[in-house]
Amino acid sequence: MDKILAAAFIAVAAHKSAKRADGITPYVLHPLRVALGVSAYTKDKDVIAAAILHDVVEDTNMTIKTLRHIFNDTVADLVEELTVPKRVTRKKKYVLAKKFSPMARLIKLNDALDNLIDLDTANWPDEKKAEYRKYLDALIKKLNSV
C-alpha cells in the first residue's frame, strides 16, 4: 500500500471520533490539510506521511514504536520530533521549535497555519481565541526566523 494512503488510513482510524474546536468538523481534516500544505513544498512521501500522522502520538494511543514498525525511521523520527507533551509550557515550545529539523519545521509551520485558519470557527471564548492567536503568530515567526 502507498505510504501516504496508509498514513491517511491510520489517521482516520486514530482520530475517528475527534472533532476540531468548532465541535463539528472531523479532526482528521486537520492533518490532511497540513499534509496538503507540506506537499506544495516537497514530494517526499515520508515527510507527507509524517505530516498526516503529526498528531497521532500526541492525541491518541498510537506509539512511535508502532509508527516505526509500520513505516520507517524517517516517518517515526519526524512524528517524534513534533510530539510535545501537553504539560510543556508555550515558552518551551518556542525553544523546541527553533531546534526542529527543516522538514519538522515545514510540518509544524503548516500545522500552525491550519490552526490559525480554523481559529475563527473555534467554539471558544474570545479571550482564549485571542491568546491562542497570539501564541500561533509568535510560533510562526519563530519557525520562519530559523
Where are these regions (language model features)?
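Active-site helical microenvironments for divalent-metal-assisted chemistry
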Residues: 1-146
